[in-house]
Regions:
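Short alpha-helical linear motifs
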Residues: 200-206, 288, 321-326, 425-431
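Short, small/polar-rich motifs associated with maturation and membrane association
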Residues: 1-305, 313, 357, 386-387
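Asparagine-centered polar/low-complexity signal
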Residues: 160, 286, 366-368, 445
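Outer-membrane beta-barrel proteins
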Residues: 86, 235-239, 250, 271-275, ...
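Proline-rich low-complexity regions
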Residues: 110-111, 118, 325, 334, ...
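Small-side-chain secondary-structure face that scaffolds active or pore-lining regions
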Residues: 193, 272-284, 295, 301-305, ...
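Acidic/polar loop-and-plug regions of large Gram-negative outer-membrane beta-barrel proteins
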Residues: 305, 310-384
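Short glycine-enriched loops at secondary-structure junctions
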Residues: 43, 355, 408-411
Length: 445
C-alpha cells in the first residue's frame, strides 16, 4: 500500500495508508496556523473573525543576512505600507507610512507596539526610532493594523495605523538549546558621478584658456620650482568597500513549566562613506509561563540596547565633485602644516592677526573632501531599555471573558558629541566643539 498525505492551509495534515479502498478524510482545523491567527492589541484573534484591515507576516526567510533595522524586514512586503529610508548612513532610520499621510501638521508616524508595550515615537540621539532598538533576529512576527479600528484599541495614538511586533519566546517543555547565527556582508558604491580626471582637466584649461592664463597657472602645485599636476580621484578617496558583521547567540529552554528565551547580539555596519560606522549590542530575555491550568498567561520581557554611531561629514560627497582633480590629497609643503598636511585653497590670513596662521583657507573655495571627513569627529552613543509585564487571565467558567493587564517602562537616552578640528577646511582656525543630550522616560500601564 501507499501512504498518502492530505493537507490544506489552515488545517492539520493527515497521513493515511491507501490500499485501493475508498477513503473519507476529514481534516481538523488548525489553531496554530499563523495565517489564521493574528496578534492584536488585546490578545490573539482568528484572521477570519477580524472585520478591520489587518496584515500579519513573519520575517521572510529570503531576508537572511545582515538586516540592521526591523523596518528593512517589512519594506515592500505589506500592501499599503510605505517604508522610506531616511539616508544611507549606517543604522539610519526610516519614515513609515500606512495608507499615506493623514495630516499636514501633526505626526503621520504609526504607533509601534513591542510585546504589548506602546512605544513613544520620539527618538533620542543615535536612536532614530523605536524599531532601531529591536534586534531583527529576535522578531517572531509583525502585525499591521491599517484602518480606523486601530483607534478602538489604542485611541488617537493609533490614528495613523499600528505596527505590532512580537518577539520570539521559549516553549513549554522544551529542552535547553544554545544556537549561534552569524553573517557578513560586503557593500560597495554602485556607481559614481562622471567627472574629469586630472589629465582631462589640464587639457580642458589648456585648450580654452591657454598655458599662459591665470586659470592654467592655478592648476596643480609648485614642487621644486616646477608646476606638477596630480590626477586625484576625489570620489575614490572618500568612499570605501564596507564590511558588516552580525552575530547572535540564543539560549532557549524550559525550567519545569517556565519557558524562557535569552539572546545577545552584536552588529557592526561600516558605511561606504569613510569613517561612518554603526555598532549595536543587544540583550533580551523573555519568560512566559502559564499558570492556573493555563488560565493565566504571563509574559515578562526585557530588552536592552547600546548603540554607537559615527557620522561622517556628508558635505564631502559634494566637495568630491567640485574639488580640482589636479591637486594632491596631502602635501609636504610647510604652508599646509596648520591644515594637517591636507591641501586647501589658501589666502593671506592677516585678518586673524595671529602670526602662527599667516594663511587661511579661502571661504568660497571647495574644501578638501578628505579633510572634511578626517577632521570631524561626530559620535552619538545611546542606551535603551524596554521592560514589560503582560498578564492575560481567562476567567474560570467564562471562556469568552478575559482580563488583560499590561505594565511596562521605556527608558532611553542618547548623547551626540561633535568636534571639528581647527585644521578643518570647514571651521578653519576656530574649530567647533559641542554636544546634545536627550533622555526619555515613559511608564505605561
Amino acid at each position: 500500500g501507499q501512504t498518502l498525505r492530505i493537507s490544506y492551509i489552515g488545517y492539520e495534515g493527515q497521513e493515511v495508508k491507501w490500499e485501493g479502498q475508498a477513503l473519507n478524510i476529514v481534516l481538523k482545523e488548525s489553531n496554530n496556523s499563523f495565517s489564521e491567527a493574528v496578534v492584536i492589541g488585546y490578545g490573539v484573534a482568528k484572521k477570519n473573525d477580524m472585520t478591520g484591515s489587518v496584515a500579519a507576516i513573519k520575517p521572510d526567510e529570503k531576508n537572511k543576512g545582515l538586516v540592521v533595522n526591523a523596518q528593512d524586514m517589512i519594506q515592500g512586503k505589506i500592501a499599503g505600507v510605505n517604508v522610506t529610508t531616511s539616508s544611507g548612513t549606517p543604522g539610519a532610520g526610516a519614515t513609515i507610512r500606512i495608507r499615506g499621510g493623514s495630516s499636514l501638521n501633526a505626526s503621520n508616524d504609526p504607533l509601534i507596539v513591542i510585546d504589548g508595550l506602546a512605544m513613544d515615537n520620539q527618538g533620542v540621539k543615535g536612536l532614530s526610532n523605536p524599531l532601531s532598538m529591536v534586534n531583527p533576529a529576535d522578531i517572531e512576527s509583525f502585525t499591521v493594523l491599517k484602518d480606523a479600528s486601530a483607534t478602538a484599541i489604542y485611541g488617537s495614538r493609533g490614528s495613523n495605523g499600528v505596527i505590532i511586533i512580537t518577539t520570539k519566546k521559549g516553549r513549554k517543555g522544551a529542552q535547553l538549546k544554545v544556537s549561534y547565527n552569524g553573517s557578513m556582508s560586503v557593500n560597495q558604491k554602485r556607481r559614481v558621478q562622471e567627472v574629469m580626471s586630472g589629465d582631462q582637466f589640464v587639457e580642458f584649461v589648456k585648450t580654452y584658456y591657454g598655458e599662459g592664463s591665470d586659470a592654467y597657472k592655478a592648476l596643480g602645485v609648485m614642487e621644486d620650482g616646477k608646476q606638477k599636476f596630480y590626477n586625484t580621484d576625489w570620489q575614490n578617496e572618500i568612499y570605501r568597500t564596507a564590511l558588516s558583521f552580525d552575530n547572535n547567540v540564543t539560549v532557549t529552554g524550559s525550567v519545569k513549566n517556565v519557558p524562557f528565551r535569552a539572546s545577545v547580539g552584536a552588529t557592526n555596519q561600516e558605511g561606504i562613506l569613510r569613517t561612518s560606522d554603526f555598532n549595536r549590542y543587544t540583550a533580551s530575555l523573555n519568560v512566559n509561563p502559564s499558570l492556573l491550568d493555563d488560565h493565566l498567561k504571563v509574559n515578562l520581557s526585557a530588552k536592552y540596547m547600546f548603540a554607537k554611531t559615527v557620522y561622517a561629514d556628508g558635505g564631502a560627497m559634494g566637495a568630491a565633485l567640485g574639488m580640482d582633480p589636479t591637486k594632491p590629497v596631502r602635501t609636504a609643503d610647510p604652508r599646509f602644516k596648520n591644515f594637517g598636511g591636507y591641501y586647501q585653497w589658501l589666502q593671506e590670513g592677516s585678518v586673524l592677526k595671529d602670526s602662527k596662521w599667516p594663511e587661511t583657507k579661502i571661504d568660497l573655495a571647495t574644501a578638501n573632501p578628505l579633510s572634511m571627513i578626517d577632521m570631524k569627529n561626530d559620535v552619538a552613543k545611546s542606551n535603551a531599555f524596554v521592560g514589560n509585564l503582560e498578564l492575560d487571565y481567562q476567567v474560570h467558567g467564562l471562556k469568552d471573558l478575559r482580563l488583560h493587564m499590561n505594565i511596562g517602562a521605556d527608558v532611553s537616552g542618547g548623547r551626540q558629541d561633535t568636534e571639528i578640528s581647527p585644521a578643518s577646511g570647514t571651521n578653519t582656525y576656530y574649530g567647533y566643539s559641542g554636544w546634545e543630550k536627550i533622555n526619555k522616560y515613559n511608564l505605561s500601564y
